[in-house]
Amino acid sequence: MARGLRPPLNGGGTRFLLYPQLPGLSNEVEPEIVFVSSPAGSVGVGPQDHRMYVVDPIGKERPYGFYPDGEGGIFHYRPPWDGPVVPPAAPGPGGHFDHLPFGTPQFEHAHAFGTVRFVLDIWESYFGHHVPWHFAEAYDRLEIVFLRGLDNAYAGFGSLEIGNYMQAPGIPVDFGLSFDIIAHEVGHLVIYSQIGLPDTDDLDGEYYGFHESAADLVSLVSLMHFESAFIGLLEESHGNLYSYNLLNRFGEVSDFEQIRLASNERKLYEFVDGWSKEHALSQPLTGAFFDIWVDIFHSKLWERGLISLHLEELSDRLEGDPGYHDVIQPLFDQAYRLAPEGFAQALAEARHHMGISLAVTWQRLSPFELDYEDVYKAYLETDALINGGRYRDMIVDNMEWRGIGKVKAGPRIKPPAADSHAFSPRTQTPPSQPQPHICSHGMPYRLRMARARGKVPA
């Protein structure tokens, strides 16, 4: 069952069965009962509630976005889908959705809805307030829409489109069953809401990398709210989070294939001459935050007397060394055997700290001229605000080891790829619509941008 959430989610909401890991990655993966905040009985056929709804169209041939109209102009193809649909998922007894059989479209519909709602609940808890959709002036609800054959998933203006593809003949990979991929897209929506949409595509390259990194971190922290993933991580790694395990995999589609790694050694120095894919550019920032999280976890273990100062310092010193695992893992194995519950408590505290500190940091950012150094400085400010600067040295060491605050990424050297998320026709605000975002600072987006440019007084 969901672990570590505020009380209304642990028994007072609507039940769903969610897979923390894409089925097929492991023979042992099982779905977990998760409660979301929508009161039992309030989620209707679809599923749908007041924030979102699911449709599985029949005959939808392309993603939403901007397309030529055949007469030299452009038209915006966007929600809602008003054509025929696959029969939707219906609630069972008590208004819950944990009764649907695996392997049916209706199970996938419920899984996608439950994932979006669960991740949104988690991050609204961390932010401490309602997270509105960035398209709220145009649409009341997010359309979670399936597009079979789309080899990706996209968060866009009013929609989250979910595809699938054939990994091999007769072996589909259904992204509606991938908690990680959907959670990543919800991460984009959270960032659009809390930071805002830029009003130009002439952006610092690091903005794109930041968006991918933030979405990965939303997914990573959310994953740790599954009890099976949380306990499984500890039982697999014995607290040595640099081990190769489920936490380090993002966008997985098989036991051996991953899109990105959280635990990586990439540095911003690699990109000073330019970059082509925001997924790659995101890795130094994601890696820095992952390393900070591990350092904080180790610090909490040491404070509880569960590991020695020698082990903590040795782990830091050997990080990246080829012999790291052979030296460090036996020491973690021994320490974990003595106090598994203490390790779990320390990891829960580190998870909570990361969620809160990321939420506070992101609210201090603006999309205008956003780069990694801005994120670095905002995170230091957050640490000073909520911890009295307790983790400053950890933050400085990990960020600057990655080159963050030392160098900047160069220009984009290739046009945006088809899978670019951060600023594309799928996410642009329609020209006829005002910018819908009202930022978390209580100031309309356009006024905030004008102030950032110095066109209005602060």
Predicted regions mapped to residue ranges:
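Zinc-dependent metallohydrolase catalytic domains
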Residues: 106-109, 113-159, 164-182, 191-457
